[in-house]
């Protein structure tokens, strides 16, 4: 009985596997066709950097302020918080008190970290 159930469940994934194989196959065929058919005539003008029709004045690599990285890391942290919070909120009715207090500890650690960043002035640009 268990073998038949497992076999039937795996059979339901067959259309997804076929679609995945077709998508990968079509992607590889299109990439190969473009590599074979494409006209290649590189010259210095084609491979040079394009900047609004003018030659590039300077190197494109510039220094960025560290605050950009700080804001991006904070965004990732709080984005992951939301990613953890949504499934927890959906299943909230079926959870025990341990799950509730675990999430409260998680949220309080993030709140304390955010308050620390705010207090240190890491989010101010002036």
From Swiss-Prot:
How does the record say this protein sits in the membrane?
Multi-pass membrane protein
Q: Which superkingdom? A: Bacteria
Transmembrane regions listed in the UniProt entry: 16-36, 73-93, 95-115
Gene3D superfamilies assigned = NADH:ubiquinone/plastoquinone oxidoreductase, chain 3
Q: Name one GO molecular function term.
A: NADH:ubiquinone reductase (non-electrogenic) activity
Q: Which UniProt keywords apply?
A: Cell inner membrane, Cell membrane, Membrane, NAD, Quinone, Translocase, Transmembrane, Transmembrane helix, Transport, Ubiquinone
Record EC number: 7.1.1.-
Would the keyword ATP-binding be found if you checked this record's keyword annotation? Answer: no
Q: What is its main location?
A: membrane
**Reactions listed under catalytic activity:** a quinone + NADH + 5 H(+)(in) = a quinol + NAD(+) + 4 H(+)(out)
| Any single Gene Ontology cellular-component annotation | NADH dehydrogenase complex
Q: Tell where it localizes.
A: Cell inner membrane
Q: Which residues form a coiled coil?
A: none
Q: What does this protein do?
A: NDH-1 shuttles electrons from NADH, via FMN and iron-sulfur (Fe-S) centers, to quinones in the respiratory chain. The immediate electron acceptor for the enzyme in this species is believed to be ubiquinone. Couples the redox reaction to proton translocation (for every two electrons transferred, four hydrogen ions are translocated across the cytoplasmic membrane), and thus conserves the redox energy in a proton gradient.
Q: How does it assemble?
A: NDH-1 is composed of 14 different subunits. Subunits NuoA, H, J, K, L, M, N constitute the membrane sector of the complex.
Protein family per UniProt: Belongs to the complex I subunit 3 family.
How is this protein named in the record? NADH-quinone oxidoreductase subunit A
